[in-house]
Amino acid sequence: MLQKNDLIVITGAGGFIGGNLVKYFYDRGLLNIRAVDKKPLDEWYLRSPATMNLQLDCTTEEACARACDGAREVYNLAADMGGMGFIERFRVECLRGILINTHMIEAAYRAGVERYFFSSTACVYSTLLQQEANVRGLKETDVYPAMAERGYGWEKLISEMFCQEYWAERGLKTFIARFHNVYGPYGTWDGGREKAPAAICRKVIEAVDTNSRTIEVWGDGHQTRSFMYIKDCLKGIDMIMHCDRLIATPINLGSSQLFSVDELIDNVERIAGVKLDRKYNPSAPRGVTGRNSDNTFIKETLGWEPNTSLEVGLRATYHWIKDQYLCRKRGECVAA
């Protein structure tokens, strides 16, 4: 059990999930947090002046050693990634993420860290199982025989193996969560790295602001995904990290409710109070046809399931992005 003064290290803390995770622990009275990201501090989405905020590039051994020094728990959420447009166009950048986990897990082991969390992804699953929109939920065992998403998916799958072998050979307690489309406030919403929920919110906001009646939709609108709100994700991370039955055992962390891209747009339009025309772009990056999470294992093991509906989560996300959009329009400095 963590004590108030135990040092927690969170990498990727200048980003979406990492920044929200820092706030999650801080709000629960765990104040000894070392927050790490390679971005300049003024570009972090969330930043607490009461935590140790370090700008470090965790693709290097030296930075990882400095980050892990004295830590009891390490949450490795650092990654060079984005939405499907980024993942498909910049596979080399995504693959370089393996340097982060390689150096972080070794640094954690050398520093005597008790628990190490690795943020994996549903992109590790075989693309051959994701060729239909009405897809069945993916079980943890479906990852083999392997045919992961090119670049990003393979990097994460290999890093999962590192976590499993550090437990088997060196006794480091590692925990692996396969995230399924996390969304919410304080995340990237433009610039090419944003994911579908944020991108659609922004497109609708722009259309309303410019009196346009049309938004571009990547793909045909029929591709499907499940979407997990950030608050549900944070609770799941905490539960996974502190369950010894899950040491070195990958587990899905996501919603099992499937939505098409068109249904996602329908939800955002209702929140905005508009109805827009859709210009479909089948040649744009679209990823697999369908992907969903089978949550049988996490329900049986932890009793966890998401409790935030897509409508509620999207409403909070939409209004946060709208505020950011309007602030930027006024020339104010905002997260991006």
Segments predicted by a language model, with ranges:
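Conserved glycine-rich Rossmann-like NAD(P)H-binding loop of the short-chain dehydrogenase/reductase
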Residues: 30-40
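Active-site YXXXK catalytic motif of short-chain dehydrogenase/reductase
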Residues: 97, 152, 156
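C-terminal substrate-binding subdomain of Rossmann-fold SDR/epimerase-dehydratase oxidoreductases
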Residues: 206-336
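N-terminal Rossmann NAD(P)H-binding glycine-rich loop of SDR-like oxidoreductase domains
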Residues: 8-28
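NAD(P)H-binding glycine-rich loop region in Rossmannoid oxidoreductase-like domains
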Residues: 51, 55-97, 110, 127
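NAD(P)-dependent short-chain dehydrogenase/reductase
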Residues: 130-137, 151, 161-241, 256-258, ...
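Conserved Rossmann-fold NAD(P)-dependent oxidoreductase catalytic core, especially the SDR/UDP-sugar
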Residues: 76, 102-149
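SDR active-site strand-loop-helix element
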Residues: 11, 36, 74-80, 116-122, ...
